[in-house]
């Protein structure tokens, strides 16, 4: 689910935090990609196009086709992807997972009714709602990435949190996902639509964490409380508090504790045993592997291994697979070109970095204005009247 309404809130109140770019502008960048989100996109996309790719036994292969060709496209554009897979979900997410199970059950009933009625549009709609990424999908995707020479990371818990940790450690430039909670976990950069197909012609949206905080005029902790108020995966939200009201409350009271002391609970009922403190802890100190100890390596593809894995039962075209492998090898050899900014060391971000940067920027602007004023005054005094 991510954070409800966060993308629009940032677009409305901190538009300077969003930049639209073509994929080619990320040449030379290393990017941590939310693997489960990608696999879901691939399964949905192929199903919505009306052709479910499958093995001779009927097992889906659309996730593998999507992963194979979309990864080649990223590498063709000089981007070095590292895929991050979800681990065990935190206990606090059980409520959200239960809601998803309920929605799935409702979709199954609706699909049955649509099938009996012969309504093709409704059948397609509810079929897509029933798509989910399984452990087998993830296992196959990891095997494919290994043969392609592309690194992946198994997160102990949430993939977005692990991606954010890799960004903060300076291992990669950004997190690529459609879930906005990557920002709540503190990812310095968030890329949306990076893994979308070229046919959709969607520009990549880049969100800057520092500029989000500056634009919203919040500290990192206040931003986390804002996200909890707006609605996250880890706890319920206060009924009647949407994005607009949430930002007003945070700006007025600065934290959830003070909000609860002042809010009109008859108008905005607070959930019973509201576990917002634990949710806050999960965002501040998520369960992640030590990013500094993770060694990311992009190696040459195993062409014969790819043919053996994708062709045969999975029915991929051998010629296309071999052509894909050659593109992978070519992009690996072309990666000797680097971005100019890669010559400079990327320092791991610190919790107070964004707040300090904002203060420093304000002080520099004030100093610059004073200097300019002083120069103008002295120039005026030294000029002779004509």
Swiss-Prot record:
Residues 345-386 are annotated as: Disordered. Phosphorylated. Phosphorylation upon DNA damage induces relocalization to the nuclear plasma. InterPro entries: 5-3_exonuclease_C_sf, Flap_endonuc, HhH2, PIN-like_dom_sf, XPG-I_dom, XPG/Rad2, XPG_CS, XPG_DNA_repair_N. It comes from the Eukaryota. SMART domains: HhH2, XPGI, XPGN. Keywords: DNA damage, DNA repair, DNA replication, Endonuclease, Exonuclease, Hydrolase, Magnesium, Metal-binding, Mitochondrion, Nuclease, Nucleus, Phosphoprotein. Its cofactor is Mg(2+). GO terms for cellular component: mitochondrion; nucleolus; nucleoplasm. SUPFAM superfamilies: 5' to 3' exonuclease, C-terminal subdomain, PIN domain-like. Residues 1-104 are annotated as: N-domain. GO terms for molecular function: 5'-3' exonuclease activity; 5'-flap endonuclease activity; DNA binding; magnesium ion binding; manganese ion binding; RNA-DNA hybrid ribonuclease activity. DNA binds at residues 47, 70, 158, 231, 233. Residues 336-344 are annotated as: Interaction with PCNA. Residues 369-386 have a biased composition (Basic residues). It is found in: Nucleus, Nucleolus; Nucleus, Nucleoplasm; Mitochondrion. GO terms for biological process: base-excision repair; DNA replication, removal of RNA primer. Mg(2+) 2 binds at residues 179, 181, 233. Mg(2+) 1 binds at residues 34, 86, 158, 160. Structure-specific nuclease with 5'-flap endonuclease and 5'-3' exonuclease activities involved in DNA replication and repair. During DNA replication, cleaves the 5'-overhanging flap structure that is generated by displacement synthesis when DNA polymerase encounters the 5'-end of a downstream Okazaki fragment. It enters the flap from the 5'-end and then tracks to cleave the flap base, leaving a nick for ligation. Also involved in the long patch base excision repair (LP-BER) pathway, by cleaving within the apurinic/apyrimidinic (AP) site-terminated flap. Interacts with PCNA. Three molecules of FEN1 bind to one PCNA trimer with each molecule binding to one PCNA monomer. PCNA stimulates the nuclease activity without altering cleavage specificity. This is Flap endonuclease 1.
